[in-house]
Structure formats: structure tokens, C-alpha cells
Amino acid sequence: IDGNNIDDDGNGYIDDYNGWNTGSNNDNTGTGGHGTNCLGMIGARGDNGLNVVGANWDVKLMVLNMGGGLTQSSVVQAYTYPLVMRQQWNQSGGAQGAFVVATSASWGIDGANPNSYPLWCQFYDTLGHYGILNVGATTNQNLDVDVAGDMPTGCTSDYMIGVGRTDNDDNTAGGYGDQTINFGAPGISVVTTSGTTSITTTTGTSFACPLTAGVIGLAYSVPCNDFMDLVISDPKAGADAVLAALTTGVDAKPQLTSRFI
């Protein structure tokens, strides 16, 4: 029940009706900013009259505001919320919590050494264990992330999918790394939601990242009883299956072989 100052669902968060803000410890996640652009790439609703649609056009979105700043502790705190919700879903057979299948991080630290953030990187393995894949936007700078470093896309966890940006001709710009960045996705001159009522054309790995997260969600929507039985009985195996389909199903482009895994 929104606004009653009670943790009705027993997940440890009071009145988390709209998501969670880790800085203010409430569900004031904000509207109309960079996050709105990213959310449109994931799941702008189909037939919305705005001439834009997300990769998954009929999906529920969990919004997080990392109000504590970009520190290792605040990042782990933010990721703990979807983890708790997915754990509840797993343990209750879907009666409680939320069926979180992917997170999207259109933020990070350019040039950061992953070895300096061990808890942050290791947390992706924890999320993956419970069935959550995680997507990260690599730097927009023309840097070899394998050499320069990047967070979070420099983390070696299988459950952190590093994504670069590509254009309509499958050319790329910005960060790359054939040991670190899994693949590229559309993120150059893409159209997405903006503000509270409009759309915009924009560029950045920030938009390739949520597009990928939306595709992960779409994969889970495929009506396949055997797959859902696997997801319920072994969430990690379900995530592994989607990850394998995603990484082996990309178009291998000659101009990208030296840029991405």
C-alpha cells in the first residue's frame, strides 16, 4: 500500500512503490532525466502515439536512483534491491517479490581499474546466481577498455555484459575491447523517450546498454514451458541459457571483430 509507512511485503523497504532511491531511502526515483531516455530503449510501450518503441514494448520496469553517489558501497547497495526482489520471487514461486531478469547500468567510471572494486565486480556473480543478467554501457571515449580499464564493463564476471555502441551500418565509435566488451548494439542517432511527454534523437553507449537489457527481457517472454520450468527450478541455469543465446546470436561483422569479444 503506497504511502502507509509500512513494509507491507516484508522485503526490508518501506513504501517502495515506484522503485528505490538509495540516497534518500524512499521511492522518489525522479522523472524526465537521463534515466527516462534509457527506460525508453528498454520498454517504451508499443502503440503509444509517440513514434518510438522499446526493445520490449510490454514490460514492467523497476527504477533505481543511486542517490548515494558512484562509490563501491552505494553501487552494491543499489544492486541489492533487485537482488532481494528476485530472491523473494524465487523463494515464493512468484507470489512475492519481482521477476527481475536484467539490470541496466548506463553509468560508470571511465578508466577505472576493476581490481580496485572487488565487491562491486563480485556482486554480479551473486546476481547471476539468482537469475539476473546485468548489462553495462562502456565508455563513450575512444578507448581500449582492455588497457585503460572501465567500470563496470571491465569486471570479468560472466554476468556483466559490456556493450559498445553501433550505427545503422554496424560501425562503432567509443569504447571497445576484444577481451572485455561483449558486443555492440544500436546507440548512434537512436530515437527514445525524453522528459515526461516527448521523444529525442540521441547517441551514446548509454542507449545501447538498455536496448540490450530490453532484449534479455524479451527473451524471457517467449512462451516455452520447458524454459520457464528451468528458470523456476534453477534460476542461474535459466540466465545462462539466455546469456548463451544472446552472445552466440549476434551478427559477426568484420569491422567489429577486433573491437568486441
What are these regions (language model features)?
Residues 1-62, 66-67, 71-102, 106-109, ...:
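Active-site core segment of subtilase-fold serine proteases
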Residues 125-128, 184:
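Anion (oxyanion) recognition and catalysis
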Residues 35, 39-42, 72, 76-79, ...:
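Extracytoplasmic/secreted envelope proteins and their assembly/folding machinery
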Residues 63, 90-107, 113, 118, ...:
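C-terminal subdomain of the subtilisin-like protease fold in secreted/lumenal serine endopeptidases
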Residues 132, 150-224:
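Extracellular S/T/G-rich loop segment that most often corresponds to the catalytic His/Ser-adjacent loop
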Residues 64-65, 103-108, 135-139, 164-165, ...:
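A cross-family glycoside hydrolase active-site/sugar-binding cleft signature
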Residues 27-36, 70, 137, 141, ...:
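Gly/Ser-rich catalytic serine loop of serine hydrolases
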